[in-house]
Amino acid sequence: MATVAPKGNCLVARAIPSDSHADQLTDLLCKLSVNGDANQKSVNKFESQHGVTPSDFRDIQNIRSSALAKKTKTSKFQLDGVTLFADLTPNSKSKKKTENQETKEKDEEAEEKKDGPPKDDKELKMKKEKEQEDENAELDEQKKDGDLLGRGPVHNVRVATGGSHPYHRAQIPYGCAAQTPITDISAYTGYGSGYECGSTWSLSPDTTIGSISASTTPDTVLSSDGYGSASPPQHSPKESLQSPFSDISSADTSRVLTPENNELPESLQDFILQYSNQYTKEESIRGRPPSADSGVSSPMSARSAPYASPHVPQGTCSGPTTPSFNQTRLSPRTSENGITAKQRLNAIIPESDLATGFHWACTTWKNVLTNRDADGDTPLHIVAAHNDLGKIYALCETLRKTMNENDDNVFNVSNNFGETPLYVAVLQRSIEVVEYLLELGASPNSRSSRAVGDSPLHFATARGMNNMVEALLSKREIRVNETNDDGQTSLLCAVKMHGMMDEQTQHKIDNKSIIEMLIKAGADPTIAETSTGKTIVHHAVDKMDVELLDFLKTVVNEDTFTELANLSDFHGDTAVDLLCSSTQNEDTNNVRENLYIRLLTSGAVPNKSRA
């Protein structure tokens, strides 16, 4: 069969030339590249997000907790952890209510579509008002639920709790001894919640002790780790005790975790895990180790709030420490108006004398113990002898501030005659300096080796220096019954020198008040002179002083005075014997009779030594 050629032009299909598949893949691979800068930025961004400071982390926690509170509608019904914990759990009824509300809204929208648009503006206005009323009602319901409570980190104010005390109003006083527990409480139950003394017995079974804590767990009413809550203890009568779930509605109670339903919602679990593991030692080099003093592993506890939590556990009660054997407790010697001896001395010194004194003290205090004169007097002895108040005050203050506690008291340094600066101040009759030195811890028992070996108390009592004797007797370590070289106590010196003339003031000495002060301070009236054996009654009879004898009868015990009236001296004479053996004259006969009668009425036996 012959082939017929087609009429007209003939189109022939040809394939378009293209690159090979291998070349295409190569081009695509060349376009791929690793962006190192972007990866480094993302890494830095991740580190900056996770390497936060403690303060930033706490802010993040507060923001998250506030968001959680708004989301879960955490309400503060009361300071009870059960209700607060119940608010964090899901409410099945609220879910059903939300679903029903959504279904109702869908139905209303469908009806509106069927009915078409509103006919006039009045219907639109009524519809808007109805929606506004519904929104207001929802807001009112939310307000009734209570204030939103942020669940951020809480720093409790921890205070040391006192020990068990039957009448516990406040902390046990410092140094108070432990109290014996009371087993029989029947005698204390008749006054309800209080007693006559105005305090409440915290161990009474009629009261339940609770403490409103910042913690929201129900089992943290009282802390047993040595700390108490910052809130005061709550006392409620036994009859009014209620279950911890009594104030919670049935709907709230159903949301409390039970043994059957003991799992938290997943969202809450994720939040808690993220909340607690966000900032740990492994994730950041700035992480802190757990607190060493609170017993918990949270990094935001105890020492993270230095102004609210203690650094170390505090004890509840402690007794006073025992001082070292060579230390003297320096207590200010205050007067009736509360002014110390230092203040009184400083008040009478002119400012110019103080300035001069401190300038001199700065150049003298280092060699105050070694720089002595021929009599062994130190610079303090010399200024005390001259009664230079400015230099005395300045040198004593400088020595007090530079004195080492373990060293001997520099104010008790004596010269070659055993005289201390205090003894020199007594000789100068400077009561302000004496009180000031006693306040600094100077000893009042030093004795001079001159004359008869008087102590400061002997010298003051023998010369009727009432204020000086009162200041010396106020010192605890004063030895009232110490004798001088003549064997006389301070009381014997006071009786012997009564009515005599003072060599410096040329005034008659009246020692009645000093005798009374000495006896009240513990002076023994039965001590006789070691050289003559005479007692205070012997000296009163020798002086022919009826008034003094009557005064001794009033300040001395009656039995003691009878004993003194019958005591004999080293010559074997009693007080009555002295009246009979002494030279008689008309001027003294009347006085002798009065003394004799008073001794007989006091129990004295006549002629006892010659019987």
Curated annotation (Swiss-Prot):
> Polar residues compositional bias: what residue ranges?
212-223, 239-255, 315-333
Highest taxon of source:
Eukaryota
| Sections of the chain in a coiled coil | 91-149
Q: Which InterPro entries match?
A: Ankyrin_rpt, Ankyrin_rpt-contain_sf, iASPP
> Biological process GO annotation list?
positive regulation of cell differentiation; regulation of transcription by RNA polymerase II
Keywords from the named record: ANK repeat, Coiled coil, Repeat
- Tissues with expression: Expressed in the nervous system.
- Basic and acidic residues composition bias: which ranges? 97-131
Q: SMART domains this protein is in?
A: ANK (SM00248)
Q: Where are the transmembrane segments?
A: none
- Pinpoint the residue ranges of every ANK repeat in the record: 375-405, 417-446, 452-482, 486-527, 532-561
- Chain spans, region Disordered: 92-167, 212-255, 280-333
Role summary: Acts downstream of the receptor complex composed of ilcr-1 and ilcr-2, which is a signaling complex that modulates neuronal activity and animal behavior in response to sensory neuron input. Mediates signaling of the complex.
**Protein family according to the UniProt entry:** Belongs to the iASPP family.
What's the name of the protein?
A: ANK repeat-containing protein nipk-1
